[in-house]
Amino acid sequence: ELYDMVSHVLVVRKQREHDLIDEQIETLYMQGVAATIEPEPAGKADAMMTLRLLTLTDLLVFFNGELTADDLQKVTTAYPQAWPAAQKLYAVISQKPVDTPFTMRRAVVKLFKAFDDQMTAWHLPVLHGTEFVTVQSVLSERQERLEVRQLFDVYHSDLLDKNKHTRAYIGLYKSDRQNAFVLPAPAQKKSDAFFKEVYDKTVKELFQEMNLPYTLR
């Protein structure tokens, strides 16, 4: 959902450039939002808060953050907690232009963190998207040639490899701590030797061995 939300920035931009979104479509969109999420119960967070947050943030993406006075009155009245929270997430998405694979990845990573911060504030379960969602890497040619140890930290995790039924390792970017890849634990090799072998490879070598797609910028 969060990744799709950022991609919708590009989709909506193209649709509006080609005049595919008019007032009728916008009215239908608002009706769809009202049909999807109920108004908040007074003064408390319920089980629908997460859905409200996602739906309203997507609404802001659809309208480029600009609602009519009438629509704004409706959402602020019906969703007094979720609406300002959605505005915060939208501010993360729209802080910088989303127009390249690199800027899209950056927005997704920041959105994962902002979403979890909001879930924590509401005392709701967090997504842990930074650790458990693998986001495709966007690398420069120089980064391709770096050793894995220069760009990533590899850790034990609670993830299980679905084929080997063993615990997996995750590779986190040093810069933003986002999950970049998941490695199955070796069946027989000691972990120290395994880590050294992985860290000694270039990033390009590791990704090619894993058949892991990435984008060059």
State each model region's role.
Residues 22-177, 183-189, 215:
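Pan-zinc metallopeptidase signature
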